[in-house]
Amino acid sequence: MTILAPVTKSESSTDPRDPLARLENLFDPGTTVPLHARDKSGVLAASGNIDGVRTIAYCSDATVMGGAMGVDGCKHLVKAIDTAIEEESPIVGLWHSGGARLAEGVEALHAVGLVFEAMVRASGLIPQISVVLGFAAGGAAYGPALTDVVIMAPEGRVFVTGPDVVRSVTGEQVDMVSLGGPDTHTKKSGVAHIAAHDEADALHRARRLVSMMCEQGEFDQRAAELGDSDLRAMMPASAKRAYDVRPIVHEMLDNVEGESSFEELQGNYARSIVTGFGRMAGRTVGVIANNPLRLGCLNSESAEKAARFVRLCNAFGVPLVVVVDVPGYLPGVSMEWEGVVRRGAKLLHAFAEATVPRVTVVTRKIYGGAYIAMNSRALGATAVFAWPNSEVAVMGAKAAVGILHKRALAAAPDDEREALHDRLAAEHEAIAGGVDRRCRNRRRRRGNRPGEDSQHRHAALASAPSVRARHKNIPL
């Protein structure tokens, strides 16, 4: 491996697409070291530090043929990935490429394929983060998609075939932003995890993720013993009212320099479930939370989103905190046709496979198949805590009574039916639902008093052995 001397800002071009300038903006000041001589390959790779973490990065050189990927450029990419694997360093890719170089023909396609193979070899071994700063078209679209986290700057465009090809083949009229811009990939396709405000923010978010994934820290028992605010005070008084779970997630996690440590991933995609990294008592954790503001039901997209995040955390030894308030799987013909059974099974598989410590907190209710899917003890949860008065059942009491006592309700006089239904529902809940019964059956631990939540969560996570799994992180 050829390592050249560190470069200074004055040596880099003033072109905003200049790869050296972009790499310098990613790395800690004065730590950028190119891994090869600058050439016309359309790629520049370098090593450097991110918050002190040794990191490998590569950047498309959009000043040369629009960053198109040729044989030589792909060799640089493969070498950079191999170096990161050998050093067990994270790797960050800055993408601004029009795809394979047409002039190099099939050889270029073969070279791009070798890049993909190297990325898959690195999967699950080292964190791979992609930052899309411009076009990532054709073959270059699949590069970011094979990595663990994809961040898009406002100018980012990801598509396999551009608007002209789409128009000529299908007759559809579409512009580049609608086809492959950040809104499309954070809200519709789920390809991107984060939409940044600008290029500087995109690089900042990449740095933050490298720090959290590679410098995970340890639980600070002193911080845990201080407890936290009464999270239940943030819940609505009525059990029927929706609420946004994200403020509760933020409150569970640390603030770092006055800023919440929570970095949400895919926040605008499959919004009934929230996923992201944060720090809890100084330790990096992954958080998965049902969001009642968006119905809170599991569906095909949210189950798949959560499953991928569970496997990402498991691959890199990140403990999980699962915040549960879910009425079950969303029913409907469209859900069945969209593959809720197949895609929902991915979440079951991911949790059952996971070896990292993982704690579940039931805040209000958990019914039906979601009872199992949301990190149940049956799937290997380290501990499951339930707040007082939370409901745990096959289904809600009122719905269950409508089935179990259908004949009695039908036979009741009209003016008495509603009162009978309410009485039967209360009896059913006392017998079959509620946290107390689950605790007696040792499926759950009893609810905590205000301020004790964090102590129990931290203790359960800190005491459990953390075994980092060795599996690939396939983009589910």
Curated annotation (Swiss-Prot):
Probably a dodecamer composed of six biotin-containing alpha subunits and six beta subunits. Pathway: Metabolic intermediate metabolism; propanoyl-CoA degradation; succinyl-CoA from propanoyl-CoA: step 1/3. Gene3D superfamilies: 2-enoyl-CoA Hydratase, Chain A, domain 1. The keyword RNA-binding does not apply. Transmembrane segments: none annotated. This is Propionyl-CoA carboxylase beta chain. GO terms for cellular component: acetyl-CoA carboxylase complex. Residues 1-476 are annotated as: Carboxyltransferase. Belongs to the AccD/PCCB family. It catalyses: propanoyl-CoA + hydrogencarbonate + ATP = (S)-methylmalonyl-CoA + ADP + phosphate + H(+). It comes from Rhodococcus erythropolis (Arthrobacter picolinophilus). The gene is pccB. PROSITE patterns: COA_CT_CTER, COA_CT_NTER. InterPro entries: AccD/PCCB, AcCoA_carboxyl_beta, ClpP/crotonase-like_dom_sf, COA_CT_C, COA_CT_N. The keyword DNA repair does not apply. Keywords: ATP-binding, Ligase, Nucleotide-binding.
